[in-house]
Amino acid sequence: MILFPAIDLKGGQCVRLKLGDMQQATVYNTDPAAQAKSFEEQGFEWLHVVDLDGAFAGHSANGDAVEAILKATKNPVQLGGGIRTLDHIEAWLARGLRRVILGTVAVRNPDLVIEACRKFPGHVAVGIDAKGGKVAVEGWAEASELGVIELAQKFEGAGVSAIIYTDIDRDGILAGINWASTLALAGAVSIPVIASGGLASLDDVRRMLEPDARKLEGAISGRALYDGRIDPRQALALIKASRAKETA
């Protein structure tokens, strides 16, 4: 299990939203590159980055900040928000990004996702953002009629490296992960699932390490880390102990 610290970018700054609302953004750091380096120094293995402005605009809007992050950390970075074309994907991977996250385009043009997986094997994830059980698109601004599992199953066998599942109704309010919907998704597909939205405490980390959650690749934490509700040392120690137990 991997704990992914999150950097959400708005106007070149690290922010966290409440319930996906761009008007409810709290600035946590004005230097995203320094934040990325700090997460690496704390012992995290990956970094999850979202270009919030890009998600709404449909193209990269915080490119300079993302490039600074890539230069500042040796950790692999996954990026979502505004990545809509094969050219976008190729350009970011060429700059050192480990994995792109395709969200809106996965709904609008699933064939592009399949082609991206063929062209860039191991480097493409799908982001599924849900509100009321339905998939949301365009930076969470629009709701679709598509169900979460219905969308995920479209990519079985395509080579998608992970599904990042965000419960918008839990995001940024420290309400705890929606375990029912998250585990239902993980049980419905063979693609590894990463939980996002609501991770609130060490109890949530412990819950992820229980046997029925083993299908999860990991979880993303934002506000709980920034607010000090999750101690990185304790969380990473729990994960390390769990891995040791699995390999013993």
Swiss-Prot record:
It is an enzyme of class 5 (isomerase). The active site is at D8 (proton acceptor), D129 (proton donor). One of its GO terms (cellular component) is cytoplasm. It is found in: Cytoplasm. Its EC number is 5.3.1.16. It catalyses: 1-(5-phospho-beta-D-ribosyl)-5-[(5-phospho-beta-D-ribosylamino)methylideneamino]imidazole-4-carboxamide = 5-[(5-phospho-1-deoxy-D-ribulos-1-ylimino)methylamino]-1-(5-phospho-beta-D-ribosyl)imidazole-4-carboxamide. One of its GO terms (biological process) is L-histidine biosynthetic process. CDD domains: HisA (cd04732). Pathway: Amino-acid biosynthesis; L-histidine biosynthesis; L-histidine from 5-phospho-alpha-D-ribose 1-diphosphate: step 4/9. The lineage of its organism: Bacteria, Pseudomonadati, Pseudomonadota, Alphaproteobacteria, Hyphomicrobiales. Gene3D superfamilies: Aldolase class I. The keyword Plastid does not apply. Keywords: Amino-acid biosynthesis, Cytoplasm, Histidine biosynthesis, Isomerase. It comes from Rhizobium etli (strain CIAT 652). This is 1-(5-phosphoribosyl)-5-[(5-phosphoribosylamino)methylideneamino] imidazole-4-carboxamide isomerase. GO terms for molecular function: 1-(5-phosphoribosyl)-5-[(5-phosphoribosylamino)methylideneamino]imidazole-4-carboxamide isomerase activity. It comes from the Bacteria. Belongs to the HisA/HisF family.
